[in-house]
UniProtKB/Swiss-Prot annotation:
Residues annotated as binding substrate: M75, C76, H77, M113, E114
Active site: residue positions: D128
Catalytic function, reaction form: (8S)-3',8-cyclo-7,8-dihydroguanosine 5'-triphosphate = cyclic pyranopterin phosphate + diphosphate
InterPro entries xrefs: MoaC, MoaC_bact/euk, MoaC_sf, MoCo_biosynth_MoaA/MoaC, Mopterin_CF_biosynth-C_dom
Pathway named in the protein's UniProt entry: Cofactor biosynthesis; molybdopterin biosynthesis
Keyword terms, alphabetized: Lyase, Molybdenum cofactor biosynthesis
Descriptive protein name: Cyclic pyranopterin monophosphate synthase
CDD domains, A to Z: MoaC_PE
Pfam families for the chain: MoaC
Transmembrane segments: none
NCBIfam families per UniProt: moaC, PRK09364.1
UniProt similarity note: Belongs to the MoaC family.
Function according to Swiss-Prot or TrEMBL: Catalyzes the conversion of (8S)-3',8-cyclo-7,8-dihydroguanosine 5'-triphosphate to cyclic pyranopterin monophosphate (cPMP).
Amino acid sequence: MADFSHLDEKGRVQMVDVSDKKTTDRLAIAVGKLSMKPDTLASILDQAMPKGNVLETARIAGIMAAKKTWELIPMCHPLELTHVQVDFFPETETSSIRIEGQARVAGRTGVEMEALTAVSVAALTIYDMCKSADKAMAIEKIHLVRKYGGKSGEFVNEG
């Protein structure tokens, strides 16, 4: 069985002690996809949804969520994020929106969860704002694509 840093020697859950780690610049990038009907995508892009500008609202929600990750995920450390960015890439040929979230910090622990949370909440916000028009939307394949900084170095997800 792999060693899990969130478990102590007795198997109890703990928050990882990062006090001996060096402060380094860290970055994480996550992506996800939201599939929908072509009419729904067109309405989002035309800013014709009844609840307003869907993508800008989702961008703000994703940024806010990244800043609150430590309040949502029990063993995450509170971080002084230096940058959070959420971008949207509409794909008309697949009737979907690719969501990319990026988080940066100069700190002792990584920002993977913050990037993943930004993408997740941005996707949920789009779903919430458009569900009256398209209940069949699907949030898909939210995953980490890149991270660097810290002891483990760089990770690039080729898949």
